[in-house]
């Protein structure tokens, strides 16, 4: 959480597309509680910048030359664990979302996200650690289901062998006999 509510959230944007960086900065320029303090065009450049200035939030592109966002993410989290990282991409790939969250990302947004969504993600990551949207929710739930679709051995249904009496009771139940009728037939 921010120490002072009056201090703007300091943001670095790392993306190899100059126009995208400029567009995000322009779209959020009216937000007085967000201040862009630097920008980088690749992961290596970003690591160099971080030696001089550490932001509250990094908007990090996944696909960049020299060092990708995927490669630089764990390095940033190791060196600067308090920095919140919002991954930006054109990809809406569930397995990618899960991988990035496991590497330490605090949110995942597609580049076609509205500027208000980006703003909300920045604020929420600072205030609450993570920002989840439909993309992240679906991806994480899908991955969780896939990981837990395997039934543990001790819970797996074992082959059940019924004795003659149990088989008769089951057959009578299927024939919709009453409990009294079943009891009379079995005894």
Predicted regions and their residues:
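Receiver (REC) domain active-site loop signature in two-component systems and cognate sites
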Residues: 64
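Short hydrophobic/Thr-rich beta-strand motif most characteristic of the beta2 strand and flanking loop
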Residues: 33-41, 49
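Active-site beta3 strand of CheY-like receiver
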Residues: 53-59
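Helix-turn-helix DNA-binding segment
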Residues: 152-187
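Short, flexible helix-to-coil linker/hinge segments that flank and couple to helix-turn-helix
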Residues: 96-101, 107, 112-160, 168
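Active-site residues of response regulator receiver
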Residues: 15, 61, 89
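Acidic catalytic/metal-coordinating carboxylates
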Residues: 42-45, 68-71
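Conserved acidic segment of CheY-like receiver
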Residues: 7-20, 24-28, 58, 162
């Amino acid at each position: 959480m921010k120490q002072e509510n009056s201090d703007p959230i300091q943001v670095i944007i790392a993306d190899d597309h100059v126009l995208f960086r400029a567009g995000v900065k322009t779209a959020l320029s009216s937000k007085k509680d967000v201040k862009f303090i630097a920008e980088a065009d690749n992961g290596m450049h970003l690591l160099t910048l971080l030696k001089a200035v550490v932001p509250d939030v990094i908007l990090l592109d996944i696909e960049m030359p020299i060092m990708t966002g995927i490669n630089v993410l764990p390095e940033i989290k190791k060196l600067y664990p308090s920095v919140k990282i919002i991954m930006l991409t054109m990809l809406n790939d569930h397995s990618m979302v899960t991988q990035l969250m496991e590497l330490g990302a605090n949110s995942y947004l597609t580049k076609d996200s509205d500027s208000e969504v980006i703003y909300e993600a920045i604020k929420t990551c600072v205030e609450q650690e993570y920002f989840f949207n439909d993309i992240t929710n679906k991806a994480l739930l899908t991955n969780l289901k896939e990981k837990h679709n395997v039934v543990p051995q001790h819970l797996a249904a074992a082959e059940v062998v019924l004795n003659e009496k149990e088989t008769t009771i089951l057959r009578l139940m299927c024939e919709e006999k009453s409990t009294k009728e079943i009891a009379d037939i079995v005894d």
